[in-house]
């Protein structure tokens, strides 16, 4: 047993002494940096000692194996400890092997080898071995072997040598090609950017450059250089070629020295942005550029497992973006885009063919992969539908931005049949013609033919802008195209485009013409008509198209767009009316105009009359000073008349009467609120106001009129009759007021509340028993 334990202790001592010696050598070499040390000789010494210690550790492992067998027979209680020491030896062997691998790679990185691929391999391998050694360090540390200090020196040495190797590789690369590193952000003037490629003299130099490129690719340096190539080629040279519109005199390729080829942007002024783009010349200029670039780079290739050429590496980073640039910035701009997508199809295909020729040439030069296609996986039908939708939206945007200088009258005229049974008759009529037309009921409503039902779904006569007529025609053609489309995806795109252009109209028009609508009420009325005309046409479009998918396509348009259009129309008109009310409020907010009126003042026919309605009577020939209340009310009526004059022609009968009725209602309601909130009236003021208000009611009855028929009781009945009852109260006795009230059953009770009547009586008549009795009886 003593012999076994002595053998174990002897092995343990040898391992610790060996590790201590190696650790000191590593510290002297990498940590203390002793000048007297011969680096290469010391490195060889450390490597030899690591090998010797590895042999000792392996021998120890074998001896411990024999010791385990002997201990199992002689002393079973020591078996667990011996097995633990055997495992420690195995861990140490693995750690020493990893350290030896690290030192071996450091020797390669430190050597002056001309094979740059060995550098790249050593950098990657050394990093992996260092990671493995770090993972094993904790295990041997638990067994009493501390190697953390020498391992830190290994890591520091790797960092220095790796930096030196990377720097040397970068220097070799820069001697072969000088490409500036530019920001990806497109800022500043890049017309002075250039890059150079230097010719490689001998076969040996070419081999060394290829090894350099391979090593840089292995350690991750090449992708950064490829990004620099990508920015210079695409963002500088290709963009300049596209911006020139014809590719003429965009760049210069020269040889400042016999072994240098330089590419630089021509400083001469190029074409303007609005110049027509020539696809053939632009792509020809690009082809010449890449051909010359290929001529100076064709011999550069990688010597790793990929075997790629340097041109293919550049092509891999520019291929997708360059193809997108050709499609988007060259072909798409040159090809005409129309709403029908039929006119541009032939020319677009021709331009695509020119682009495909360029792609094939790039494949020959090695910049594009063999799988590269100009259109990727897209088919031409999808492209044409997308372009058509883009054209529809562009045309709609142009129509929305047009001013309302050209106006058109739409809707049925005044001679249209008006019959309460029109709907039932039209339904019977439709059933009759359904037998003749079959499923083509759209002919009954076609805008291109005389309608069979001029009053069914009739749109009242009004004025809209010509741009709106064109907008509706564009929308109608779009919807019909969606119905006629057989492809489900294309049909959905066209239907969505129809919905989108209506939303664009709703959102953009109030913003684009906001100043116009706020300053000219007539234009606000035109916009109101435009919105309702579009809504009407959207509803009738369902009769102009037929098919099983009719409901699916039209339902979103009907449910969403019609509501949006009517809402924005109402908002615009309400803003106009709000401004009008605000201006009238400025005249009526001074309550002093209702007080201290001239004694026995009487209005005449010319009071509140329009200028064209005034007669040459005595009060015109001899002008008199009118009280302030007359001037303020006349100003309000003048404002309403001006609005009415501007809106009578464009608006429909109903809308016109509602708009003017709203303004008149506001005026009358303002007067009513003033009277019912006044606590005391002078007798003369009450009599004059009764006369003034009576004359005012006569005038507004003529203002809220259409076709010489007053509509005041239809559109502002509440305010009109309330003021009429107040006129009665102001100009009559208490007994007459009681009779008109008639126990809350008379005409006065229909329009005025008891509290309002009581308040008027208290303000008009002095406090007396008779007044108290009357109030009690109300």
Curated annotation (Swiss-Prot):
Q: Which gene encodes it?
A: czw-1
* GO process terms (BP): cell division; chromosome segregation; endoplasmic reticulum to Golgi vesicle-mediated transport; mitotic spindle assembly checkpoint signaling; protein localization to kinetochore; regulation of attachment of spindle microtubules to kinetochore
Question: Which residue spans adopt a coiled-coil conformation according to this UniProt entry?
Answer: 47-99
Task: Give the keywords, sorted.
Answer: Cell cycle, Cell division, Centromere, Chromosome, Chromosome partition, Coiled coil, Cytoplasm, Cytoskeleton, Kinetochore, Mitosis
Species in which this protein is naturally found: Caenorhabditis elegans
Protein's UniProt keywords contain Cytoplasm: yes
Q: Which GO terms describe its cellular component?
A: cytoplasm; kinetochore; nucleus; RZZ complex; spindle
User: Which Gene3D superfamilies does this chain map to?
Assistant: 1.10.357.150
- Name the job this protein performs: Essential component of the mitotic checkpoint, which prevents cells from prematurely exiting mitosis. Required for the assembly of the dynein-dynactin and mdf-1-mdf-2 complexes onto kinetochores. Its function related to the spindle assembly machinery and kinetochore-microtubule attachments likely depends on its association in the mitotic RZZ complex. The RZZ complex recruits the spindly-like protein spdl-1 to kinetochores. To prevent irregular chromosome segregation, the complex also inhibits the attachment of the kinetochore-associated NDC80 complex to microtubules.
* Family from the record: Belongs to the ZW10 family.
**Annotated protein name in UniProt:** Centromere/kinetochore protein zw10 homolog
Q: Transmembrane segments in this chain: where? A: none
């Amino acid at each position: 047993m003593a012999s076994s334990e002595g053998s174990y202790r002897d092995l343990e001592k040898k391992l610790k002494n060996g590790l201590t010696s190696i650790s000191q050598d590593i510290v002297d070499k990498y940590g203390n940096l002793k000048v007297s040390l011969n680096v290469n000789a010391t490195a060889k010494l450390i490597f030899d000692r690591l090998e010797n210690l590895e042999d000792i550790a392996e021998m120890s492992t074998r001896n411990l194996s024999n010791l385990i067998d002997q201990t199992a027979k002689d002393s079973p209680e020591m078996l667990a400890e011996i097995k633990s020491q055997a495992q420690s030896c195995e861990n140490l062997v693995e750690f020493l092997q990893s350290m030896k691998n690290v030192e071996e790679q450091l020797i390669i990185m430190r050597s002056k080898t001309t094979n740059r691929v060995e550098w790249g391999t050593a950098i990657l391998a050394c990093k992996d071995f260092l990671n493995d050694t770090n993972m094993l360090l904790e295990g041997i540390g638990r067994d009493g072997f501390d190697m953390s200090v020498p391992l830190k020196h290994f890591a520091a040495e790797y960092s220095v040598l790796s930096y030196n190797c990377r720097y040397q590789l970068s220097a070799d690369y820069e001697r072969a090609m000088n490409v500036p590193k530019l920001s990806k952000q497109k800022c500043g003037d890049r017309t002075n950017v250039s890059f150079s490629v230097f010719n490689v003299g001998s076969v040996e130099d070419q081999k060394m450059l290829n090894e350099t490129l391979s090593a840089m690719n292995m350690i991750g340096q090449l992708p950064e250089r490829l990004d620099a190539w990508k920015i210079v080629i695409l963002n500088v040279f290709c963009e300049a070629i596209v911006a020139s519109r014809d590719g003429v005199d965009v760049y210069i390729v020269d040889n400042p020295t016999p072994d240098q080829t330089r590419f630089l942007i021509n400083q001469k002024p190029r074409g303007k942005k609005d110049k027509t783009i020539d696809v053939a010349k632009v792509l020809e200029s690009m082809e010449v550029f890449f051909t010359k670039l290929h001529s100076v780079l064709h011999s550069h290739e990688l010597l790793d497992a990929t075997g790629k050429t340097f041109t293919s590496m550049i092509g891999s980073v520019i291929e997708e973006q360059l193809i997108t640039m050709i499609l988007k910035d060259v072909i798409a701009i040159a090809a005409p885009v129309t709403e029908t997508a039929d006119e541009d199809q032939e020319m677009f295909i021709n331009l695509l063919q020119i682009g495909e020729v360029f792609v094939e040439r790039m494949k020959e030069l090695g910049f594009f992969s063999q799988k590269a296609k100009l259109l990727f996986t897209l088919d031409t039908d999808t492209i044409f539908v997308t372009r058509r939708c883009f054209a529809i939206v562009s045309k709609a945007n142009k129509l929305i931005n047009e001013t309302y200088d050209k106006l058109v009258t739409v809707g049925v005229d005044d001679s249209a049949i008006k019959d309460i049974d029109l709907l039932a008759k039209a339904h019977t009529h439709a059933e009759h013609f359904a037998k003749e037309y079959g499923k083509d009921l759209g002919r009954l409503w076609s805008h291109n033919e005389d309608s069979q039902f001029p009053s069914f779904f009739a749109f009242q006569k009004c004025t809209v802008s010509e741009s709106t007529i064109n907008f509706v025609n564009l929308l109608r053609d779009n919807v019909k195209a969606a119905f006629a489309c057989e492809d489900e995806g294309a049909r959905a795109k066209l239907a969505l485009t129809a919905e989108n252009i209506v939303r664009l109209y709703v959102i953009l028009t109030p913003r684009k013409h906001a100043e116009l609508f706020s300053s000219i009420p007539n234009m606000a009325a035109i916009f109101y008509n435009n919105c309702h005309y579009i809504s009407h046409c959207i509803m009738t479009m369902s009769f102009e198209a037929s098919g099983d998918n009719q409901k699916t396509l039209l339902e979103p348009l009907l449910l969403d767009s019609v509501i949006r259009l009517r809402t924005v129309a109402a908002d615009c008109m309400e803003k106009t009316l709000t401004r009008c009310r605000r201006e009238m409020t400025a005249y009526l907010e001074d309550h002093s105009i209702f007080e201290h009126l001239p004694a026995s003042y009487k209005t005449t026919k010319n009071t509140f009359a329009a200028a064209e309605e005034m007669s040459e009577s005595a009060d015109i020939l001899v002008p008199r000073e009118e009280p302030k209340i007359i001037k303020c009310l006349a100003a309000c009526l003048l404002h309403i008349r001006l609005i009415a004059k501007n809106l009578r022609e464009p608006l429909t009968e109903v809308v016109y009467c509602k708009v003017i009725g709203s303004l008149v209602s506001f005026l009358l309601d303002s007067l009513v609120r003033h009277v019912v909130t006044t606590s005391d009236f002078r007798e003369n003021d009450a009599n004059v106001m009764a006369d003034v208000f009576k004359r005012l009611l006569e005038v507004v009855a003529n203002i809220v009129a259409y076709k010489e028929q007053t509509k005041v009781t239809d559109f502002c009945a509440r305010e009109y009759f309330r003021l009429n009852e107040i006129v009665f109260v102001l100009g009559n006795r208490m007994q007459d007021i009681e009779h008109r009230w008639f126990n809350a059953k008379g005409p006065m009770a229909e329009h005025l509340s008891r509290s309002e009547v009581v308040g008027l009586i208290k303000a008009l008549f002095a406090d007396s028993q008779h007044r108290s009795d009357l109030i009690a009886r109300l």
